[in-house]
Curated annotation (Swiss-Prot):
Organism field: Bacillus subtilis (strain 168)
Pfam families, A to Z: DUF2187
Domain of life: Bacteria
Name listed for the protein in its UniProt record: Uncharacterized protein YkvS
Amino acid sequence: MKIAKVGNVIEFKNGLTGVVEKVNENSVIVDVTIMDNYRDLELDSLTVVNHKNYKIIRDSY
């Protein structure tokens, strides 16, 4: 399992995507406001995702 770094774009939970804001021991904090349909989904802007539950789709810049 590859652990994401700050700035990575990850995919999790039924195709949601977001940018990693902080890396913790067992999880990452993700900003999901990059999604085009963010407002339609009525999500909070930040969410916590366990390392086991995401896939890195783009490395940080």
